[in-house]
Amino acid sequence: MNFKISGHHLDITPPLREYVETKLERIVRHFDQVIGVSVLLSVDNHKEKDRRQYAEINLHLKGKDIFVEAHHEDLYAAIDALVDKLDRQVIRYKDRVQGHDREAVKYQMAAAQMQQ
């Protein structure tokens, strides 16, 4: 798995990198076909304080790319919200992919039973 983390107007410190990596382990545990991950953390000068810290992620899966973004006044809270959103999308995608495979097997078994 390729992992890239970058920051705009922000230095990526080792504790921040480790925090992001530990949060993303949850995603890999749910779905093991992750090809690459690119994370962008940014600090902007918005008038609204709750939108100053920005985090986005591009998750490259086998057959699909997922993009998620989150804003918050605390960068760690933005990362938490980002991973929660990403987790929901990955689980939904995994269910969709596995659901199609199960339906195909179910129809094949039903067709085989009808031929007998």
Swiss-Prot record:
InterPro entries, sorted: HPF/YfiA_ribosome-assoc, RHF-like, RHF/RaiA
Pfam families to which the protein is assigned, alphabetical: Ribosomal_S30AE
Molecular-function GO term, any one: ribosomal small subunit binding
Claim: Transmembrane is one of the keywords in the record: no
GO (cellular component) term, any one: cytosolic small ribosomal subunit
Keyword Transport: no
GO biological process: negative regulation of translational elongation
Record key words, sorted: Translation regulation
Subunit structure: Associates exclusively with 100S ribosomes, which are dimers of 70S ribosomes.
Record function comment: During stationary phase, promotes and stabilizes dimerization of 70S ribosomes by the ribosome modulation factor (RMF), leading to the formation of inactive 100S ribosomes.
PANTHER family from the UniProt entry: 30S RIBOSOMAL PROTEIN
Record-stated family: Belongs to the HPF/YfiA ribosome-associated protein family. Short HPF subfamily.
Protein name, UniProt field: Ribosome hibernation promoting factor
Species this protein is from: Cupriavidus necator (strain ATCC 17699 / DSM 428 / KCTC 22496 / NCIMB 10442 / H16 / Stanier 337) (Ralstonia eutropha)
Gene (name only): hpf
